[in-house]
C-alpha cells in the first residue's frame, strides 16, 4: 500500500499526444507544463502527417515509463492506432492512458484498448 501511495503522489500532470487542434485546446485549458532544468521537457506532443511513428512511440514511452510526474496521458485515437501495439501492451495503473476523439476522427469504441480489456474481463 505504501509503495502505491508513493507512486501516485508525485503524479500531478496531464500529458497529451494529439493533433494540433486537440493539443492547442488542452493547452488553452491549462494543462501545459515544462520541466525545470537544462533538459526541459514538455508534457505534450503535436502530431501531424509528417510526424514519424518513431517520434510518437518515443513520446509515449517518455510519458508512460520515464516521467514519474504524469498521472493521465490523453492520446487521439487515430494517433494511438499508429502505435497500437504499445498502447495495448501498456498495463500499468499510472499513468492512465485515455484515447480521445479529434475534430476529424470520431471516437470508435471498438478500437479503444481500455474498453477491450473491460470486455475481456467480463467475458464479452
UniProtKB/Swiss-Prot annotation:
One of its GO terms (cellular component) is vacuolar proton-transporting V-type ATPase, V1 domain. It is a peripheral membrane protein. Coiled coil: none annotated. Pfam families: ATP-synt_F (PF01990). The keyword Membrane applies. Disulfide bonds: none annotated. GO terms for molecular function: proton-transporting ATPase activity, rotational mechanism. It is found in: Vacuole membrane. It comes from the Eukaryota. Keywords: Hydrogen ion transport, Ion transport, Membrane, Transport, Vacuole. Its main location: membrane. V-ATPase is a heteromultimeric enzyme composed of a peripheral catalytic V1 complex (components A to H) attached to an integral membrane V0 proton pore complex (components: a, c, c', c'', d, e, f and VOA1). NCBIfam families: V_ATP_synt_F. Subunit of the V1 complex of vacuolar(H+)-ATPase (V-ATPase), a multisubunit enzyme composed of a peripheral complex (V1) that hydrolyzes ATP and a membrane integral complex (V0) that translocates protons. V-ATPase is responsible for acidifying and maintaining the pH of intracellular compartments. Belongs to the V-ATPase F subunit family. This is V-type proton ATPase subunit F. It comes from Neosartorya fischeri (strain ATCC 1020 / DSM 3700 / CBS 544.65 / FGSC A1164 / JCM 1740 / NRRL 181 / WB 181).
